[in-house]
Amino acid sequence: MAKKSMIAKQQRTPKFKVQEYTRCERCGRPHSVIRKFKLCRICFRELAYKGQIPGVKKASW
C-alpha cells in the first residue's frame, strides 16, 4: 500500500506538467500502472481473474 502522504501529494497539481505520474486508483502503487485501466499490474490481474474488468479474460492457446 502506498503511504497516505504520497497519495495526498500526488493529488495536488504539480508546478510543471512533467512532474505528473500515474498511480493505481485502487491501491496507490506508482509503478507498472496500465494507463488504459488506471490500475497496477497486481490489481489488474486480481480483477481480471475475478471477471470484474469487461472485455478481459485469461489467454489460453
Swiss-Prot record:
- Where is Zn(2+) bound in this sequence? 24, 27, 40, 43
Which Cys pairs does UniProt list as disulfide-bonded?
Answer: none
Query: Knockout: what is the outcome?
Result: Cannot be disrupted; as the protein decreases in cells 70S ribosome formation decreases rapidly, with concomitant loss of uS2, uS3 and YugI (general stress protein 13) proteins from the 30S subunit.
User: What keywords are annotated for this sequence in UniProt?
Assistant: Metal-binding, Ribonucleoprotein, Ribosomal protein, RNA-binding, rRNA-binding, Zinc
Q: Which GO terms describe its biological process?
A: translation
The UniProt note on the cofactor reads as follows: Binds 1 zinc ion per subunit.
Q: Give the family this protein belongs to, as stated in its UniProt record.
A: Belongs to the universal ribosomal protein uS14 family. Zinc-binding uS14 subfamily.
PANTHER family in the cross-refs: 30S RIBOSOMAL PROTEIN S14, SMALL RIBOSOMAL SUBUNIT PROTEIN US14B
What the protein does comes down to: Binds 16S rRNA, required for the assembly of 30S particles and may also be responsible for determining the conformation of the 16S rRNA at the A site.
Provide the assembly information: Part of the 30S ribosomal subunit. Contacts proteins S3 and S10.
Name-wise, this protein is Small ribosomal subunit protein uS14B
Q: Which gene encodes it?
A: rpsN1
